[in-house]
Regions:
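Solvent-exposed coil/turn segments that connect beta secondary-structure elements
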Residues: 42, 50, 69-71, 80-82, ...
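Active-site-adjacent loops and short helices of periplasmic peptidoglycan-processing enzymes
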Residues: 96-252, 262
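SH3/SH3-like beta-barrel fold
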Residues: 61, 75-79, 334
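Boundary regions of SH3-family modules and the immediately adjacent low-complexity/disordered segments
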Residues: 24-32, 78-100
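Beta-loop motif signature
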Residues: 26-72
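C-terminal segment of classical bacterial N-terminal signal peptides
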Residues: 11-22
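Penicillin-recognizing serine hydrolase domain
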Residues: 103-109, 213-368
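Bacterial N-terminal signal peptides that target proteins for export
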Residues: 1-5
Length: 368
């Protein structure tokens, strides 16, 4: 590193000592790494792997000695014998790159990670316990995918809606029209479309009874599957995410669940559906379904790279979205929990689960 760059950093950083910027092990893991990488123009240097601790901004093509990589997507670098952090996409193995300026996401928690490798590109409060609302349904669908893979059921398996599946679910949790009725027969694929596109809670319970014999048995399976995936701060008490103080998870656990679900091609297809038509049943006329994900249909939030997956909203959870996007051979998974619905100066409302997800997609697919 040149003397001029060292001097500039010394003046900017001042008296920050070697031990001031230490990683908080409870929040961030650090994998050892050794490399010399170059900054892109506008690379930001942080005291900790957290965008709130900005120290300075570097010009392009500054060589930095890397000593590690944090679990939330930062390089650990040495500057003036001190440890600092630079966002991963701000460094490159070659000169002449453009750094991606890191911006915080306006939500209680957010992340974006690689769906293939599991590497997090950006994370913000990713391990905080929060209400997931209907993003819970990804776990419900994952267990249905498991049952299909095990040969226990098939997409064309007919299912009769029981009165017990409908019992105890408030009317505002039914989102298909007309609502499912006891005695109505649909197949597994149609019920999955009701869950993923229209976020129907009754359909979740119908599938739960099919897979596990009862809703309670299915909920136990949900929690066991979450534990096996390494989910933390996670406890499911229903199949749909309907608000309950004992129903919670975190952004990273939703990332793990969604990453697992994406191993199933059928899940990928259903998650990417912008719309579907449910044929007439023995008790209802044809139903038309449309995704609740504004990134996947004509809207101000439309993103051509978006391929899924599930929205969620409740007063207790705020606005939530677990998303996925693909560009060339790269697929990323995004999670936004606790976003707002902000009133803008022109009287419109900014639905931040969508606007913030678009920021995450831009981060995750930069340079791909």
């Amino acid at each position: 590193m040149s003397g001029a760059v060292l001097m500039a950093l010394t003046l900017t950083i001042g008296c920050i000592g070697v031990n001031t910027a230490t990683v908080q092990a409870a929040e961030y893991g650090v994998a050892p790494a050794t490399a010399v990488l170059y900054t892109g123009s506008g690379a930001e240097v942080f005291a900790q792997p957290d965008p709130a601790t900005l120290v300075t901004v570097l010009p392009g093509d500054v060589p930095l000695q890397v000593t590690g990589m944090t679990s939330n997507g930062y390089f650990q670098v040495v500057v003036n014998d001190g440890i600092f952090y630079v966002y991963g996409k701000a460094l490159s193995a070659a000169v002449g790159t453009n750094a991606y300026k890191l911006t915080s996401i306006d939500a209680k928690a957010a992340l974006v990670g690689d769906a293939a490798t599991g590497q997090l590109i950006y994370a913000q409060n990713a391990y905080d316990r929060l209400a997931p609302a209907s993003t819970t349904k990804i776990m419900t669908v994952l267990l249905v995918m498991d049952a299909i893979a095990q040969g226990k059921i098939a997409l064309d398996t007919p299912v009769m809606v029981s009165s017990t599946a409908l019992a105890g679910i408030p009317s505002d949790a039914s989102h298909v029209s007309p609502r499912l009725k006891a005695g109505e027969v649909m197949n597994v694929l149609e019920l999955l479309e009701c869950v993923m596109l229209s976020s129907d809670c009754h359909a979740c319970n119908v599938l739960a009874e099919l897979v596990a014999g009862s809703v309670d048995n299915f909920i136990a399976m949900m929690n066991a599957r979450a534990a096996a995936l390494g989910c933390t701060e996670t406890n499911f008490v229903n199949t749909s995410g309907y608000p309950d103080p004992n129903h919670y998870t975190n952004a990273y656990s939703l990332f793990l669940i969604t990453k697992e679900a994406y191993h199933y091609p059928v899940f990928q297809v259903i998650a990417a559906m912008p719309a579907a038509v449910i044929p007439a049943t023995n008790m209802a006329p044809e139903r038309s379904l449309e995704t609740t994900n504004a990134l996947m249909k004509a809207s101000e939030y439309y993103n051509p790279y978006a391929i899924g997956v599930k929205t969620g909203s409740a007063q207790s959870s705020g606005l939530c979205l677990v998303g996925a996007a693909k560009k060339n051979d790269t697929t990323v998974i995004t999670v936004v929990l606790g976003a707002g619905n902000n009133l803008m100066s022109d009287g419109t409302r900014l639905k931040q689960q969508f606007s913030e997800t678009n920021k995450l997609i831009e981060m995750g697919l930069a340079g791909k």
